[in-house]
Amino acid sequence: MNVAFEVKDRDVAGRLGRLEVNGRRLKTPALLPVVNPNKPTLDPREISKLGFDGVITNAYIIRKHEHLREQALEEGVHGLLGFDGFVMTDSGSFQLAEYGDVEVSNEEIVRFQAKIGSDVGTILDVPTPPDAPRSRVERDLETTLKRAREAVELDEHPPLALTVQGSTYEDLRRLCAEKLAELPAAVYPVGGVVPLLEEYRFVDVVRVVLAAKSSLPPHRPVHLFGCGHPLAIPLAVAMGCDLFDSASYAIYARSDRYMSILGTLKLEELETFPCSCPACTRHDPDDVREMEPRERTRVLATHNLYELRRVIETTRQAIVSGELWELAESVCRAHPRAWAGMVELARRGGELERWCPAVKRSVFVCDEVSKGRPELRLYRRRLRDRFGELSGRKVVKGISRPYAEIVEWLEPWELAFADEWLGVVPGELSWSYPCHCLVEPSGDDEGEDRRRGEEGRRR
C-alpha cells in the first residue's frame, strides 16, 4: 500500500498535512465534493477549476449501472469522471443505511474498487442509526469489523478506508477504533454521523468523534463521513478530523438553499448575496430566482462549493496561525446547538492535550469556554505537578497583567499571582508562555486597572 501522510503544522487537534496515495497528493484538511456519476450537478472538471484536488464518488452506483460499470472498468474511475486528481470511492454503505440492503457483498465491492483504480476505497461497513438498542449496535459493529478484516486479507484491494461505527455509544466507538487501528488502512473514517448532523446534535457529534479519535493511529488521516457544512468544519478539524465530503452543495442548491458560514439561507429571503465569489458577483438574487431550475441549481451549487473551499482555506490558515480554537468558537456561535458542541469540546479539552502544541502565539480568552482550551488545561496541570501548592509565597490577587511589572519590585520567588485563566502562577513565570501573551477582555475602566497595578506594586 503506497500511502504517506505528512503533518506539517498543528493546532488544537487539527493538522495541516499532505496525504499521498499512489502518487496523487491531497492537502489536508480537505473537502471532497460528492460526484454522482449518473447525474452530476457540476462536471468534475468544473469542480477541479474551483480549486478542489479530490472528489468522492459511489462505487456501488457505478457497479449497478452497466454503462458506468463498463466505462469504469475500461478507463478507470478517473477516466469515467474526467478527473485526474484524488478520487475516493464509497461502497454503498449510505444506500445500506437508507434502504436496509444492497445488491453486492463486501468482497465484491472492495474488489471492484480495486479494478477501477480508486485511490482510496471503502469497505461495506454497517452504519447504525443514533440511539439504536445496544444489542443491535454490537451486532452491526461485529459485522463491520469482520468485513474490515476480510477486506485487508483480499489479494486484490485498493488502499482502504476502514470506517469506525458504534452509533452514539462512546465505548463502542472506542472499541471499534481500537480494533480497526490494528489493521492497515489509508484512511480511518468516522461513519454514522449524518443523522446527528442533520438534527444539529453537535454535542453527540463531539462525543463520538472524540471517542473514535482517541484510539486511532496518528499517522493516518481521519475522515468525518457526511460532514459538509461550513458551520461544522472548523469544530470538526479542532477535534482532529482531516477529510470531509459534501453532497450538500448540490442537495441544498436543488432546493434553493445558499450556504454560509453562519448557516443556510433560503434564496427567496435573500436581498443580496453576502459573498464575493464569482457566482455571486455575476448575479444578484433576483436574477437567480428568475433562472430555469437547472441553471439556478448550477449557480447555487457553484457558490456553495466556493463557500466550502473558503472555509477549508480559512481553517488551514487558522492552524498555521495558531487560531483554530478562536475560529471554531466564532463559527459555532452562529447557532445555539453548534455552540453547545463547542461547549462540550471545551468541557473535554483535556482529551485534546496530547495533540495540541504546548507553546504557540498569543492566546485569546473570552469566557468559561476559553478555560477549556487544551493548552491552558495543560499549563494549569503542569503548574500543579511541578510547583504544588506554592506555600510560603505571597499570593497577589486583582492585578492586571503583565505580572512582570510587579515582579520588578520584589523577588519573583516570593510571589505568586492568582489568575482567572491560568490558576496560581509563580512570579518567576511572569514572562513565560502563556502568561505574557494571554489576551483577555479588558475592563471598562482602564484607569482602574492601572490603579490596581500600582497598589500591587506598593504591596
Curated annotation (Swiss-Prot):
A GO term for molecular function: zinc ion binding
Protein name per UniProt: tRNA-guanine(15) transglycosylase
Family according to the record: Belongs to the archaeosine tRNA-ribosyltransferase family.
Record-listed substrate binding positions: D125, G192
Job of this protein: Exchanges the guanine residue with 7-cyano-7-deazaguanine (preQ0) at position 15 in the dihydrouridine loop (D-loop) of archaeal tRNAs.
GO cellular component, one term: cytoplasm
Pathway: tRNA modification; archaeosine-tRNA biosynthesis
Top-level taxonomic group: Archaea
Stored InterPro entries: ArchSynthase1/Queuine_TRR, TGT-like_sf, TgtA, tRNA_ribo_trans-like
The reaction(s) this protein catalyses: guanosine(15) in tRNA + 7-cyano-7-deazaguanine = 7-cyano-7-carbaguanosine(15) in tRNA + guanine
Keyword Disulfide bond: no
Keywords: Glycosyltransferase, Metal-binding, Transferase, tRNA processing, Zinc
Enzyme Commission number: 2.4.2.48
Positions contributing to Zn(2+) binding: C275, C277, C280
HAMAP family on file: TgtA_arch (MF_01634)
